[in-house]
Amino acid sequence: MKLAFDDAGRGDCVVLIHGHPFDRTLWAPQLAALRDRFRVIAPDLRGFGRSPVTAHRVTMREYAADIEELLDGLGIGPAAVVGLSMGGLVTMELAAFQPERYWAIALVATTMQPPTPQDRATRLERAAAVERDGMAVLVDYMHTGVYGPACPPSVRARVDAMMDAAPPEGAAAALRGRAERPDYRPLLAGLDIPALVCAGSADPWSDEPVTAEIVASLRRPETVIIDGVGHLPNLEAETEFNAALGAFLRAHAPG
């Protein structure tokens, strides 16, 4: 799978993996902040942005394999991976499959838990609705929790436009893939690399218990909770998020 991607800067490599139903432009502030010190790769996952769409279902392992293929094609060896929401699931797939390849990971607004039977059924129903009725179905759902109470209107407008532009087939395929995600807790219990765990205190999905469970499941966690923001701390609290992520990456970079 040939992914569209941005490639900026020089130095130790950092890969930024967006969530669902977004695209690589979600990371524009971080790419700008990190490119002076790192080589930053920000791909569009399969089915989003300018990457090809695969209909019906794409699993987290398939998204991860696309990233591995991209890094192999670019001749990139050790890298850090930063994933938000579904991108965090893909990050965990990468780290579980090839832990020796990554010098650090960052898990932002995500979960290690497998879906419950009800969650699985809901995602499958929502996938069918998105295919039938378009992205408005998913955007309406995202509005129930994606933004914190003080999210700037400019961020809302930008993210709404990003979600509206997502291909319905790609978004539905991701929903079905997420419905089949594994339990990452045992897969990452022995992971011996630094792991930044970041969430917003007003995120109803990656809430305090979910985030605490991620921290408890890792050997070398570092935790950042950003007060008052929702599911997109990298945009709602750009300055604070960039400072925390940059400090973490600089502290653990091999170069």
Sequence positions of predicted segments:
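Short alpha-helix in the alpha/beta-hydrolase fold that links the catalytic acid
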Residues: 193, 207-216
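Catalytic active-site module of serine/aspartate enzymes centered on a nucleophile-bearing elbow/loop
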Residues: 221-255
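Conserved acidic catalytic loop of the alpha/beta-hydrolase fold
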Residues: 64-79
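Conserved hydrolase catalytic core segment
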Residues: 77-116
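Short beta-strand/loop motif that positions the catalytic acidic residue
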Residues: 191, 197-199
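Conserved HGGG/HGGXW glycine-rich cap/lid loop of the alpha/beta-hydrolase fold
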Residues: 6-56, 60, 70
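Conserved alpha/beta-hydrolase catalytic His-Asp/Glu region
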Residues: 115-121, 132-190
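Acidic catalytic loop of the alpha/beta-hydrolase fold
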Residues: 201-206
